Amino acid sequence: MSTQKIGFFGLMKSFDSAESAFETMAGGGLTATVKHELMRGVTIDHLIWWFRNIDQTTTFNGGDFDGAAIDVYKLWHPHDHIKVRWKKKITDDSGHIQPGSVIGIHETFGGFVVNESSLITQFDREGFHFQMGILGLKVGHLLHFYREIDGGVLYETEMEIKCRAPLIGKLLTWLACRFFATEPKIRAWMQHNIEECGESEKFIPQLYEHSRTVNSESGRRVSASECIPTSSH
């Protein structure tokens, strides 16, 4: 059992706080699933807002918003997260991020460095899903499922490494599992995923509410300025 890390808000979740499974798939490939403890006080609105704004900064210090500026991504996992950014944004008329968008993730866990771009295949009130590829072909996915219940959100993550393309699928699966997504790397990711998701309830609701307050106050200032009569000459 690994030693629990200390994040910005105290002890991070231990590996055994979640239900997890790792499997070698028939015909090649790997799959890992993590069912997290209830994210207490978190809602679907919080999570959707979070993923849309995951590349932003904040001054939240755990108590108020008078701290130094920091990437919100680093609050999620201060030890492992380096940088995240939306490399391509496809939005609807309301500005909501749509499938086809691309997110770039730079992080490290268990001695493994990740600096990759992933295609968003679903982003709605049921899940936030990525597709991973080699040479333009899908070789795996990372799925985030969430469901709101009384008291919080049930959150489950699934990673699968397997290419189902005809003819070269088995070869690409072997290459991916041999060089890019090895068993030790996937197991290290599972620990990382449990730790970062466990931090969500400690700061995402606060950032969400602060954003709503700031936007509301900004809207009131705009409305007031629009109501100021101009003098006529």
Task: Label every PLM stretch briefly.
Residues 2-90:
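Hydrophobic ligand-binding cavity/cleft-lining segments
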Residues 70-137:
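Glycine-rich portal/gate segments that line the openings of hydrophobic small-molecule binding cavities
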Residues 1-31, 149-233:
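Terminal "cap-and-tail" regions of soluble proteins that handle hydrophobic small molecules
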Residues 136, 146, 151:
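Active-site/pore-lining binding-face segments in mid-to-C-terminal subdomains
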